[in-house]
A protein has these predicted regions:
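Single conserved hydrophobic/aromatic residue that forms the stacking wall/gate
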Residues: 1-10
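Well-ordered alpha-helical segments embedded in enzymatic catalytic cores
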Residues: 12-16, 62, 112
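Short, well-structured alpha-helical segments in soluble
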Residues: 14-24
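Phosphate-binding and adjacent anionic-ligand microenvironments
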Residues: 22, 26-28, 32, 49-51, ...
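Short Gly/Thr/Asp-enriched flexible loops that form oxyanion-binding sites at enzyme active sites
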Residues: 37-55, 92
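Catalytic or ion-translocation cores adjacent to nucleophile or general acid/base/metal-coordination motifs
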Residues: 53-67
């Protein structure tokens, strides 16, 4: 059994709000889960059709906005940092790098982002962070993913974009043009029961014992094994990963910029594959072609991995 994950859930839950937004000609729809820690958003594309913005895209836009404002206001003094989980898009690291902001990687789960904030408290300034699963946090006063402050900030981003003659969707396209195109896709392979748990264990063992040499037609250039805390390059050189503890996660990076993260779920009988492929987008109107090319890459990756 395969499913796409949280994106499908938010698509269903946002449908009533989107229908109302169409009636009142709204610019933005936001929805949180019952405990108000995650937030999903939708906005109109260039054709006026409502589209769901995924967690990676939301994180990109809100961090892009925060860093832009920090830079314009002269608030970047040195020592500022952001945090993302290891399965979140690498594109936000490019945004941070261009603005001379340190971007830290941590394990999935906001306790790890909160840990990085605590470790640097009084020495560095946390600006923002997030994860692909629709969790975001700006500033450091909550120490957990928080849909309330995230909704306020997303609304501010949308208002800022509108003041500059753009929609939220057009802002997203501008980010892709400036930093490169990225498409993310999560596959959840469900393996129920005791036999399923054994099968998932065997899959992870096989990935470690027989790492792929190429994925989707591109050579694997780097492997990160968070269970052994080892980083292996294409020449077989091994170095240590700087992480607080081990975790049953594997990551493969290819020459063309593709990133694949594999990990068993800690709460459900499934193994998760996080796929991120890269491309170029020369202009905002090039989105359709860039997305189509990225979709081909995603399918090639899935075929290589047999998922």
């Amino acid at each position: 059994v395969r499913s796409r994950g949280l994106g499908d859930v938010y698509k269903r839950q946002l449908s009533m709000a989107v229908n109302l937004a169409k009636e009142i000609d709204a610019d933005l729809v936001m929805a949180s889960d019952p405990d108000a820690d995650r937030v999903g958003i939708a906005c109109k594309d260039d054709k006026g059709e409502w589209v769901l913005i995924n967690g990676n895209q939301t994180c990109m836009m809100y961090l892009y906005y925060i860093l832009t404002q920090y830079k314009q206001l002269g608030k970047i003094k040195g020592g500022e940092f952001c945090v993302k989980t290891i399965v979140t898009t690498e594109l936000i690291k490019k945004i941070a790098d261009k603005n001379n902001i340190e971007m830290l990687d941590c394990y999935t789960g906001f306790k790890w982002i909160a840990r990085e904030i605590r470790l640097r408290e009084g020495k560095q300034k946390y600006i923002g962070g997030g994860e692909e699963s629709y969790g975001f946090l700006a500033e450091d006063f909550v120490r957990d993913k928080d849909a309330v402050s995230a909704c306020c900030l997303i609304a501010e981003v949308a208002a800022w974009a509108k003041d500059n003659g753009k929609s939220l969707y057009q802002l997203l396209l501008d980010i892709y043009v400036e930093y490169g195109f990225s498409k993310e896709f999560t596959v959840n392979v469900v393996k129920p029961g005791k036999s399923g748990a054994e099968e998932i264990k065997a899959m992870m063992e096989n990935f470690r014992a027989n790492p792929p040499k190429e994925i989707g037609g591109s050579a694997v250039s780097l492997i990160k094994d968070y269970k052994t805390l080892e980083l292996t390059d294409a020449q077989g050189n091994v170095s240590k990963l700087d992480m607080p503890e081990t975790s049953n996660v594997l990551q493969y990076f290819t020459v063309d910029g593709t990133k694949i993260s594999v990990r068993p779920s800690g709460t459900e009988p499934k193994i998760k594959f996080y796929i991120e492929v890269k491309g170029e987008m020369g202009c905002p109107k090039c989105y359709t072609s860039a997305d189509a090319e990225a979709e081909k890459k995603v399918e090639a990756v899935r075929k290589s991995l047999g998922i």
